[in-house]
Protein backbone atom coordinates (compact mmCIF):
# COMPACT_ATOMS: atom_id res chain seq x y z
CA UNK A 1 0.00 0.00 0.00
CA UNK A 2 1.53 3.37 -1.03
CA UNK A 3 1.66 6.34 1.33
CA UNK A 4 -1.42 8.08 -0.06
CA UNK A 5 -3.64 5.02 0.30
CA UNK A 6 -2.21 4.36 3.75
CA UNK A 7 -3.17 7.86 4.86
CA UNK A 8 -6.65 7.50 3.37
CA UNK A 9 -7.09 4.15 5.13
CA UNK A 10 -6.06 5.62 8.47
CA UNK A 11 -8.40 8.56 7.94
CA UNK A 12 -11.19 6.13 7.13
CA UNK A 13 -10.60 4.15 10.35
CA UNK A 14 -10.62 7.30 12.47
CA UNK A 15 -13.59 8.91 10.74
CA UNK A 16 -15.70 5.73 10.60
CA UNK A 17 -15.13 4.93 14.27
CA UNK A 18 -15.92 8.48 15.29
CA UNK A 19 -19.14 8.54 13.28
CA UNK A 20 -20.31 5.15 14.50
CA UNK A 21 -19.51 6.16 18.07
CA UNK A 22 -21.19 9.53 17.73
CA UNK A 23 -24.20 7.94 16.05
CA UNK A 24 -24.60 5.74 19.11
CA UNK A 25 -24.16 8.80 21.33
CA UNK A 26 -26.93 10.55 19.42
CA UNK A 27 -29.18 7.61 20.25
CA UNK A 28 -28.01 7.88 23.85
CA UNK A 29 -28.66 11.61 23.88
CA UNK A 30 -32.20 11.19 22.58
CA UNK A 31 -32.86 8.49 25.18
CA UNK A 32 -31.48 10.62 28.00
CA UNK A 33 -33.43 13.67 26.85
CA UNK A 34 -36.61 11.60 26.84
CA UNK A 35 -36.16 9.88 30.21
CA UNK A 36 -34.52 12.74 32.14
CA UNK A 37 -36.57 15.66 30.82
CA UNK A 38 -35.13 19.13 30.02
CA UNK A 39 -33.98 19.87 33.59
CA UNK A 40 -32.30 16.48 34.11
CA UNK A 41 -30.80 16.55 30.63
CA UNK A 42 -29.52 20.05 31.33
CA UNK A 43 -27.88 18.85 34.55
CA UNK A 44 -26.12 16.05 32.65
CA UNK A 45 -24.88 18.53 30.04
CA UNK A 46 -23.53 20.76 32.80
CA UNK A 47 -21.69 17.76 34.22
CA UNK A 48 -20.46 16.81 30.76
CA UNK A 49 -18.96 20.28 30.33
CA UNK A 50 -17.16 19.89 33.66
CA UNK A 51 -15.90 16.47 32.55
CA UNK A 52 -14.54 17.88 29.30
CA UNK A 53 -12.41 20.43 31.12
CA UNK A 54 -11.30 17.91 33.74
CA UNK A 55 -9.97 15.78 30.91
CA UNK A 56 -6.99 18.13 30.72
CA UNK A 57 -5.86 17.59 34.30
CA UNK A 58 -2.74 15.85 32.93
CA UNK A 59 -1.38 19.24 31.75
CA UNK A 60 -0.60 17.99 28.26
CA UNK A 61 1.35 14.84 29.18
CA UNK A 62 -0.79 12.75 26.83
CA UNK A 63 -0.01 15.02 23.87
CA UNK A 64 3.67 15.03 24.77
CA UNK A 65 3.64 11.25 25.00
CA UNK A 66 1.90 11.01 21.64
CA UNK A 67 4.70 13.02 20.04
CA UNK A 68 7.77 11.56 21.77
CA UNK A 69 6.59 7.94 22.06
CA UNK A 70 5.56 7.90 18.40
CA UNK A 71 9.04 9.08 17.42
CA UNK A 72 10.66 6.51 19.72
CA UNK A 73 8.59 3.73 18.16
CA UNK A 74 9.52 4.92 14.66
CA UNK A 75 13.22 4.76 15.57
CA UNK A 76 12.75 1.33 17.20
CA UNK A 77 13.41 2.54 20.74
CA UNK A 78 10.63 0.35 22.10
CA UNK A 79 11.75 0.34 25.74
CA UNK A 80 12.04 4.12 25.78
CA UNK A 81 8.61 4.46 24.17
CA UNK A 82 7.09 2.18 26.81
CA UNK A 83 8.73 4.22 29.57
CA UNK A 84 7.30 7.41 28.11
CA UNK A 85 3.84 5.84 28.00
CA UNK A 86 4.18 4.67 31.60
CA UNK A 87 5.25 8.13 32.72
CA UNK A 88 2.29 9.70 30.91
CA UNK A 89 -0.03 7.19 32.58
CA UNK A 90 1.27 8.20 36.01
CA UNK A 91 0.86 11.93 35.34
CA UNK A 92 -2.59 11.30 33.91
CA UNK A 93 -3.72 9.28 36.94
CA UNK A 94 -2.28 11.71 39.50
CA UNK A 95 -3.91 14.68 37.76
CA UNK A 96 -7.28 12.93 37.59
CA UNK A 97 -7.17 11.95 41.27
CA UNK A 98 -6.22 15.52 42.23
CA UNK A 99 -9.18 16.97 40.31
CA UNK A 100 -11.54 14.34 41.74
CA UNK A 101 -10.33 15.21 45.24
CA UNK A 102 -10.94 18.89 44.48
CA UNK A 103 -14.51 18.14 43.41
CA UNK A 104 -15.05 16.11 46.59
CA UNK A 105 -13.74 19.01 48.69
CA UNK A 106 -15.98 21.57 46.97
CA UNK A 107 -19.15 19.53 47.38
CA UNK A 108 -18.35 19.03 51.08
CA UNK A 109 -18.61 22.78 51.73
CA UNK A 110 -21.73 23.35 53.89
CA UNK A 111 -24.51 25.44 52.40
CA UNK A 112 -23.35 25.12 48.80
CA UNK A 113 -26.41 24.92 46.51
CA UNK A 114 -25.40 22.15 44.11
CA UNK A 115 -28.37 19.79 44.41
CA UNK A 116 -27.80 16.11 45.06
CA UNK A 117 -24.21 15.84 46.31
CA UNK A 118 -23.98 12.13 45.50
CA UNK A 119 -24.33 12.95 41.81
CA UNK A 120 -21.20 15.08 42.03
CA UNK A 121 -19.42 12.32 43.92
CA UNK A 122 -20.20 10.08 40.96
CA UNK A 123 -18.85 12.80 38.68
CA UNK A 124 -15.57 12.76 40.61
CA UNK A 125 -15.33 9.02 39.95
CA UNK A 126 -16.06 9.63 36.28
CA UNK A 127 -13.15 12.08 36.07
CA UNK A 128 -10.69 9.32 37.00
CA UNK A 129 -12.18 6.64 34.74
CA UNK A 130 -12.61 9.04 31.81
CA UNK A 131 -9.05 10.35 31.99
CA UNK A 132 -7.55 6.88 32.06
CA UNK A 133 -9.67 6.00 29.04
CA UNK A 134 -8.33 9.08 27.23
CA UNK A 135 -4.79 7.95 28.10
CA UNK A 136 -5.50 4.50 26.66
CA UNK A 137 -6.65 6.02 23.37
CA UNK A 138 -3.55 8.23 23.15
CA UNK A 139 -1.32 5.26 23.95
CA UNK A 140 -2.79 3.25 21.09
CA UNK A 141 -2.40 6.16 18.67
CA UNK A 142 1.25 6.55 19.68
CA UNK A 143 1.71 2.96 18.46
CA UNK A 144 -0.29 3.72 15.29
CA UNK A 145 -2.79 1.02 16.21
CA UNK A 146 -5.66 2.97 14.68
CA UNK A 147 -7.78 -0.09 13.99
CA UNK A 148 -7.70 -1.27 17.60
CA UNK A 149 -8.25 2.26 18.87
CA UNK A 150 -11.30 2.59 16.63
CA UNK A 151 -12.71 -0.78 17.72
CA UNK A 152 -12.41 0.11 21.40
CA UNK A 153 -14.09 3.47 20.77
CA UNK A 154 -17.04 1.73 19.15
CA UNK A 155 -17.20 -0.77 22.02
CA UNK A 156 -17.29 2.01 24.59
CA UNK A 157 -19.97 3.90 22.68
CA UNK A 158 -22.09 0.75 22.39
CA UNK A 159 -21.80 -0.07 26.09
CA UNK A 160 -22.48 3.49 27.25
CA UNK A 161 -25.50 3.78 24.98
CA UNK A 162 -27.14 0.50 25.99
CA UNK A 163 -26.33 0.47 29.69
CA UNK A 164 -26.53 4.25 30.04
CA UNK A 165 -30.04 4.57 28.66
CA UNK A 166 -31.20 1.61 30.76
CA UNK A 167 -29.67 3.20 33.85
CA UNK A 168 -31.42 6.50 33.11
CA UNK A 169 -34.72 4.70 32.54
CA UNK A 170 -34.54 2.83 35.85
CA UNK A 171 -32.80 5.28 38.20
CA UNK A 172 -32.59 8.63 36.45
CA UNK A 173 -29.34 10.53 36.15
CA UNK A 174 -27.78 8.63 39.08
CA UNK A 175 -28.33 5.36 37.23
CA UNK A 176 -26.82 6.80 34.08
CA UNK A 177 -23.65 8.00 35.86
CA UNK A 178 -23.20 4.63 37.57
CA UNK A 179 -23.67 2.84 34.24
CA UNK A 180 -21.09 5.11 32.61
CA UNK A 181 -18.46 4.26 35.24
CA UNK A 182 -19.25 0.56 34.77
CA UNK A 183 -18.82 0.94 30.99
CA UNK A 184 -15.35 2.42 31.40
CA UNK A 185 -14.34 -0.46 33.66
CA UNK A 186 -15.66 -3.01 31.16
CA UNK A 187 -13.79 -1.27 28.35
CA UNK A 188 -10.55 -1.37 30.38
CA UNK A 189 -11.03 -5.08 31.01
CA UNK A 190 -11.59 -5.76 27.33
CA UNK A 191 -8.49 -3.79 26.41
CA UNK A 192 -6.39 -5.65 28.97
CA UNK A 193 -7.48 -9.16 28.06
CA UNK A 194 -7.58 -8.82 24.27
CA UNK A 195 -4.94 -6.21 23.50
CA UNK A 196 -2.57 -6.13 26.46
CA UNK A 197 -3.21 -2.41 26.80
CA UNK A 198 -3.14 -1.63 30.50
CA UNK A 199 -1.15 1.35 31.80
CA UNK A 200 2.18 0.48 33.41
CA UNK A 201 2.85 3.29 35.86
CA UNK A 202 6.36 4.77 35.80
CA UNK A 203 7.58 7.55 38.11
CA UNK A 204 10.14 9.65 36.25
CA UNK A 205 10.12 13.36 37.07
CA UNK A 206 12.48 14.34 34.26
CA UNK A 207 10.45 12.57 31.59
CA UNK A 208 7.19 13.86 33.10
CA UNK A 209 8.48 17.44 32.89
CA UNK A 210 9.58 16.83 29.31
CA UNK A 211 6.19 15.46 28.30
CA UNK A 212 4.34 18.34 29.94
CA UNK A 213 6.63 20.96 28.36
CA UNK A 214 5.95 19.47 24.95
CA UNK A 215 2.24 18.85 25.38
CA UNK A 216 1.17 21.87 27.40
CA UNK A 217 0.90 24.29 24.43
CA UNK A 218 -1.07 21.65 22.52
CA UNK A 219 -3.31 21.16 25.55
CA UNK A 220 -3.95 24.91 25.78
CA UNK A 221 -5.03 24.91 22.14
CA UNK A 222 -7.34 21.95 22.68
CA UNK A 223 -8.71 23.57 25.83
CA UNK A 224 -9.51 26.75 23.91
CA UNK A 225 -11.31 24.71 21.25
CA UNK A 226 -13.38 22.97 23.91
CA UNK A 227 -14.17 26.34 25.47
CA UNK A 228 -15.17 27.77 22.09
CA UNK A 229 -17.56 24.89 21.45
CA UNK A 230 -19.06 25.21 24.93
CA UNK A 231 -19.00 28.92 25.77
CA UNK A 232 -22.60 29.28 24.60
CA UNK A 233 -23.74 26.35 26.74
CA UNK A 234 -21.76 27.58 29.76
CA UNK A 235 -23.39 31.01 29.58
CA UNK A 236 -26.84 29.48 29.05
CA UNK A 237 -26.27 27.30 32.13
CA UNK A 238 -25.09 30.22 34.29
CA UNK A 239 -27.54 32.88 33.11
CA UNK A 240 -30.63 30.84 32.18
CA UNK A 241 -30.47 27.65 34.27
CA UNK A 242 -30.26 23.92 33.66
CA UNK A 243 -33.76 23.65 32.11
CA UNK A 244 -32.79 26.11 29.35
CA UNK A 245 -29.45 24.35 28.96
CA UNK A 246 -31.22 21.02 28.48
CA UNK A 247 -33.30 22.44 25.63
CA UNK A 248 -30.48 24.35 23.95
CA UNK A 249 -27.81 21.65 24.28
CA UNK A 250 -29.80 18.88 22.57
CA UNK A 251 -28.77 20.12 19.13
CA UNK A 252 -25.10 19.85 20.07
CA UNK A 253 -25.28 16.06 19.67
CA UNK A 254 -25.77 16.66 15.94
CA UNK A 255 -23.18 19.42 15.51
CA UNK A 256 -20.63 17.43 17.52
CA UNK A 257 -21.16 14.46 15.21
CA UNK A 258 -20.58 16.63 12.14
CA UNK A 259 -17.30 17.96 13.50
CA UNK A 260 -15.95 14.48 14.17
CA UNK A 261 -15.05 13.82 10.53
CA UNK A 262 -12.71 16.81 10.08
CA UNK A 263 -11.37 16.22 13.60
CA UNK A 264 -10.56 12.61 12.75
CA UNK A 265 -8.99 13.62 9.45
CA UNK A 266 -6.89 16.31 11.15
CA UNK A 267 -5.75 13.87 13.84
CA UNK A 268 -4.38 11.45 11.24
CA UNK A 269 -3.34 14.01 8.64
CA UNK A 270 -1.22 16.29 10.84
CA UNK A 271 1.89 14.07 11.15
CA UNK A 272 1.80 13.42 7.41
CA UNK A 273 1.47 17.14 6.65
CA UNK A 274 4.51 17.82 8.83
CA UNK A 275 6.47 15.04 7.14
CA UNK A 276 5.44 16.09 3.63
CA UNK A 277 6.30 19.75 4.12
CA UNK A 278 9.54 18.87 5.88
CA UNK A 279 10.69 16.50 3.11
CA UNK A 280 9.83 18.70 0.18
CA UNK A 281 11.44 21.90 1.54
CA UNK A 282 9.16 23.67 -0.95
CA UNK A 283 6.56 26.33 -0.22
CA UNK A 284 4.51 24.96 -3.11
CA UNK A 285 3.76 21.85 -1.04
CA UNK A 286 2.29 23.98 1.75
CA UNK A 287 0.14 25.89 -0.72
CA UNK A 288 -1.11 22.66 -2.23
CA UNK A 289 -2.05 21.17 1.14
CA UNK A 290 -3.86 24.36 2.11
CA UNK A 291 -5.88 25.16 -0.99
CA UNK A 292 -6.57 21.72 -2.46
CA UNK A 293 -7.17 20.18 0.96
CA UNK A 294 -9.65 22.83 2.07
CA UNK A 295 -11.46 22.66 -1.27
CA UNK A 296 -11.78 18.89 -1.10
CA UNK A 297 -12.90 18.79 2.53
CA UNK A 298 -15.45 21.59 2.16
CA UNK A 299 -16.90 19.95 -0.96
CA UNK A 300 -17.20 16.62 0.84
CA UNK A 301 -18.88 18.14 3.91
CA UNK A 302 -21.50 20.30 2.14
CA UNK A 303 -23.93 17.42 1.43
CA UNK A 304 -23.47 16.12 4.99
CA UNK A 305 -24.32 19.55 6.40
CA UNK A 306 -27.32 19.85 4.09
CA UNK A 307 -28.72 16.48 5.17
CA UNK A 308 -28.13 17.26 8.86
CA UNK A 309 -29.91 20.62 8.48
CA UNK A 310 -32.94 19.04 6.82
CA UNK A 311 -33.16 15.96 9.06
CA UNK A 312 -32.67 17.70 12.42
CA UNK A 313 -36.34 18.73 12.93
CA UNK A 314 -37.70 15.23 12.28
CA UNK A 315 -36.69 13.29 15.44
CA UNK A 316 -37.27 16.31 17.68
CA UNK A 317 -40.73 16.95 16.26
CA UNK A 318 -41.91 13.36 16.79
CA UNK A 319 -39.81 11.98 19.65
CA UNK A 320 -38.97 15.02 21.79
CA UNK A 321 -41.65 17.70 21.31
CA UNK A 322 -40.68 19.34 24.63
CA UNK A 323 -37.39 20.32 22.97
CA UNK A 324 -38.89 21.93 19.85
CA UNK A 325 -37.12 25.23 20.59
CA UNK A 326 -33.74 23.60 19.88
CA UNK A 327 -34.49 23.06 16.17
CA UNK A 328 -33.83 26.58 14.82
CA UNK A 329 -30.58 27.22 16.77
CA UNK A 330 -29.47 23.71 15.89
CA UNK A 331 -29.90 24.42 12.19
CA UNK A 332 -27.96 27.68 12.55
CA UNK A 333 -25.05 25.85 14.18
CA UNK A 334 -25.15 23.03 11.61
CA UNK A 335 -24.54 25.61 8.88
CA UNK A 336 -21.95 27.38 11.04
CA UNK A 337 -19.83 24.23 11.28
CA UNK A 338 -18.86 24.90 7.66
CA UNK A 339 -16.36 27.48 8.96
CA UNK A 340 -14.28 25.25 11.26
CA UNK A 341 -14.52 22.46 8.68
CA UNK A 342 -13.08 24.73 5.99
CA UNK A 343 -10.37 25.81 8.44
CA UNK A 344 -9.33 22.29 9.48
CA UNK A 345 -6.58 21.90 6.91
CA UNK A 346 -5.46 25.51 7.44
CA UNK A 347 -4.92 24.72 11.12
CA UNK A 348 -2.78 21.67 10.32
CA UNK A 349 -0.69 23.59 7.78
CA UNK A 350 -0.30 26.53 10.17
CA UNK A 351 1.03 24.30 12.95
CA UNK A 352 3.33 22.48 10.51
CA UNK A 353 4.80 25.85 9.50
CA UNK A 354 5.43 26.91 13.09
CA UNK A 355 2.30 28.98 13.64
CA UNK A 356 1.12 27.39 16.89
CA UNK A 357 0.91 30.73 18.69
CA UNK A 358 -1.16 32.25 15.91
CA UNK A 359 -3.56 29.31 16.12
CA UNK A 360 -3.84 29.80 19.89
CA UNK A 361 -4.55 33.50 19.36
CA UNK A 362 -7.21 32.62 16.77
CA UNK A 363 -8.87 30.24 19.22
CA UNK A 364 -8.76 32.83 22.00
CA UNK A 365 -10.27 35.44 19.69
CA UNK A 366 -13.02 33.00 18.74
CA UNK A 367 -13.84 32.36 22.40
CA UNK A 368 -13.98 36.10 23.14
CA UNK A 369 -16.21 36.88 20.16
CA UNK A 370 -18.53 33.96 20.96
CA UNK A 371 -18.69 34.92 24.63
CA UNK A 372 -19.57 38.52 23.83
CA UNK A 373 -22.12 37.54 21.20
CA UNK A 374 -23.84 34.94 23.37
CA UNK A 375 -23.78 37.17 26.44
CA UNK A 376 -25.39 40.06 24.56
CA UNK A 377 -27.99 37.71 23.07
CA UNK A 378 -28.99 36.41 26.50
CA UNK A 379 -29.02 39.84 28.16
CA UNK A 380 -31.17 41.31 25.38
CA UNK A 381 -33.61 38.39 25.46
CA UNK A 382 -32.83 37.44 21.88
CA UNK A 383 -33.70 33.77 22.34
CA UNK A 384 -31.94 30.57 21.35
CA UNK A 385 -31.43 31.57 17.70
CA UNK A 386 -29.59 34.75 18.70
CA UNK A 387 -27.45 32.69 21.09
CA UNK A 388 -26.57 30.30 18.26
CA UNK A 389 -25.64 33.23 16.00
CA UNK A 390 -23.29 34.52 18.69
CA UNK A 391 -21.63 31.10 18.89
CA UNK A 392 -21.40 30.98 15.09
CA UNK A 393 -19.59 34.33 15.08
CA UNK A 394 -16.91 32.79 17.29
CA UNK A 395 -16.46 29.84 14.92
CA UNK A 396 -16.14 32.19 11.95
CA UNK A 397 -13.59 34.34 13.80
CA UNK A 398 -11.29 31.42 14.61
CA UNK A 399 -11.52 29.92 11.13
CA UNK A 400 -10.97 33.29 9.47
CA UNK A 401 -7.88 34.21 11.49
CA UNK A 402 -6.27 30.77 11.17
CA UNK A 403 -6.95 30.60 7.42
CA UNK A 404 -5.56 34.10 6.84
CA UNK A 405 -2.44 33.25 8.84
CA UNK A 406 -1.97 29.95 6.98
CA UNK A 407 -2.24 31.72 3.62
CA UNK A 408 0.42 34.21 4.74
CA UNK A 409 2.77 31.48 5.99
CA UNK A 410 2.26 29.45 2.82
CA UNK A 411 3.08 32.50 0.69
CA UNK A 412 -0.16 32.70 -1.28
CA UNK A 413 -0.22 35.75 -3.51
CA UNK A 414 -3.17 38.13 -3.45
CA UNK A 415 -4.98 36.75 -6.56
CA UNK A 416 -4.64 33.20 -5.23
CA UNK A 417 -5.97 34.27 -1.82
CA UNK A 418 -8.97 36.00 -3.35
CA UNK A 419 -9.75 32.99 -5.53
CA UNK A 420 -9.39 30.55 -2.63
CA UNK A 421 -11.62 32.56 -0.27
CA UNK A 422 -14.13 33.24 -3.04
CA UNK A 423 -14.52 29.52 -3.71
CA UNK A 424 -15.18 28.84 -0.02
CA UNK A 425 -17.64 31.75 0.24
CA UNK A 426 -19.55 30.66 -2.86
CA UNK A 427 -19.67 27.11 -1.57
CA UNK A 428 -21.18 28.28 1.73
CA UNK A 429 -23.68 30.49 -0.11
CA UNK A 430 -24.67 27.52 -2.27
CA UNK A 431 -25.16 25.41 0.87
CA UNK A 432 -27.50 28.01 2.39
CA UNK A 433 -29.45 28.39 -0.85
CA UNK A 434 -29.79 24.63 -1.32
CA UNK A 435 -31.19 23.91 2.15
CA UNK A 436 -33.48 26.95 2.01
CA UNK A 437 -34.70 25.96 -1.44
CA UNK A 438 -35.27 22.33 -0.47
CA UNK A 439 -37.21 23.35 2.65
CA UNK A 440 -39.30 25.79 0.62
CA UNK A 441 -39.97 23.45 -2.29
CA UNK A 442 -40.97 20.50 -0.09
CA UNK A 443 -42.74 21.72 3.08
CA UNK A 444 -42.93 19.61 6.23
CA UNK A 445 -45.94 17.48 7.20
CA UNK A 446 -46.24 17.80 10.99
CA UNK A 447 -49.51 15.85 11.13
CA UNK A 448 -48.26 12.55 9.68
CA UNK A 449 -45.06 10.76 10.70
CA UNK A 450 -44.90 8.62 7.55
CA UNK A 451 -45.50 11.57 5.22
CA UNK A 452 -43.04 13.71 7.16
CA UNK A 453 -40.36 11.02 6.76
CA UNK A 454 -41.06 10.72 3.03
CA UNK A 455 -40.94 14.48 2.48
CA UNK A 456 -37.74 14.80 4.51
CA UNK A 457 -36.19 12.06 2.35
CA UNK A 458 -37.26 13.95 -0.76
CA UNK A 459 -35.72 17.19 0.53
CA UNK A 460 -32.45 15.41 1.26
CA UNK A 461 -32.47 13.78 -2.18
CA UNK A 462 -32.88 17.17 -3.86
CA UNK A 463 -29.99 18.60 -1.85
CA UNK A 464 -27.72 15.64 -2.62
CA UNK A 465 -28.55 15.90 -6.32
CA UNK A 466 -27.25 19.47 -6.35
CA UNK A 467 -23.96 18.59 -4.62
CA UNK A 468 -23.31 15.25 -6.35
CA UNK A 469 -21.61 16.62 -9.52
CA UNK A 470 -19.19 18.75 -7.51
CA UNK A 471 -18.32 15.86 -5.20
CA UNK A 472 -17.74 13.52 -8.13
CA UNK A 473 -15.51 16.06 -9.85
CA UNK A 474 -13.50 16.63 -6.66
CA UNK A 475 -13.02 12.91 -6.14
CA UNK A 476 -11.88 12.35 -9.72
CA UNK A 477 -9.43 15.22 -9.40
CA UNK A 478 -8.11 13.73 -6.17
CA UNK A 479 -7.68 10.30 -7.79
CA UNK A 480 -5.87 11.84 -10.76
CA UNK A 481 -3.46 14.21 -8.99
CA UNK A 482 -4.56 14.17 -5.37
CA UNK A 483 -3.30 16.69 -2.83
CA UNK A 484 -2.35 13.80 -0.54
CA UNK A 485 0.32 12.83 -3.06
CA UNK A 486 2.58 15.39 -1.42
CA UNK A 487 2.85 13.02 1.54
CA UNK A 488 4.52 10.32 -0.54
CA UNK A 489 8.12 9.47 0.34
CA UNK A 490 10.91 11.28 -1.46
CA UNK A 491 12.11 9.16 -4.35
CA UNK A 492 8.67 7.85 -5.30
CA UNK A 493 8.52 8.12 -9.06
CA UNK A 494 5.10 9.78 -8.95
CA UNK A 495 6.13 12.49 -6.48
CA UNK A 496 5.87 16.01 -7.85
CA UNK A 497 7.17 19.22 -6.28
CA UNK A 498 5.99 21.47 -9.08
Predicted regions and their residues:
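Transmembrane alpha-helical segments of multi-pass transport proteins
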Residues: 121, 156, 170, 365-369, ...
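Interhelical loop/hinge segments that connect adjacent transmembrane helices in multipass membrane
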Residues: 1-7, 121, 147, 151, ...
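Transmembrane helical elements of multi-pass membrane transporters/channels
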Residues: 9-26, 156, 176-187, 191, ...
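Hydrophobic alpha-helical transmembrane segments
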Residues: 120-121, 150-197, 214, 364-372, ...
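Membrane-interface junctions at transmembrane-helix termini in multi-pass inner-membrane proteins
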Residues: 128-151, 199, 334-365
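Helix-loop junctions and terminal segments of transmembrane helices
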Residues: 59-75, 142, 251, 255-294, ...
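Interfacial segments at transmembrane-helix termini and the short loops linking adjacent helices
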Residues: 3, 107-123, 291, 309-338, ...
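N-terminal membrane topogenesis motif
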Residues: 1-26, 78-82, 86, 205-221, ...
Amino acid sequence: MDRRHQILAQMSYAAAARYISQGLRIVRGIGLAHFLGPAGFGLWNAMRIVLQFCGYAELGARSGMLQHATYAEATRQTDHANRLRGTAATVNLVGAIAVAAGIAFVISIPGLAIGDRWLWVALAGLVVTQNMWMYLQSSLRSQRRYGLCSSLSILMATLSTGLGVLGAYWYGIAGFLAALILCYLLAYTTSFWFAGQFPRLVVDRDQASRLIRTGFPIMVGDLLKVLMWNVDKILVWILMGKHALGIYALQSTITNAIMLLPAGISEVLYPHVVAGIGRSKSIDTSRRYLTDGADLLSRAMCPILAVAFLVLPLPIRWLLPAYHETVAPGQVLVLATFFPIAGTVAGSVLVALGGQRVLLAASAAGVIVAGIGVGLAIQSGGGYVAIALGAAAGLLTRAGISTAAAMTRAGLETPARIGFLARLALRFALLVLVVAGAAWAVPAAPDSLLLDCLLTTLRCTLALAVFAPGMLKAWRTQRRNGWLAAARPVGDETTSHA
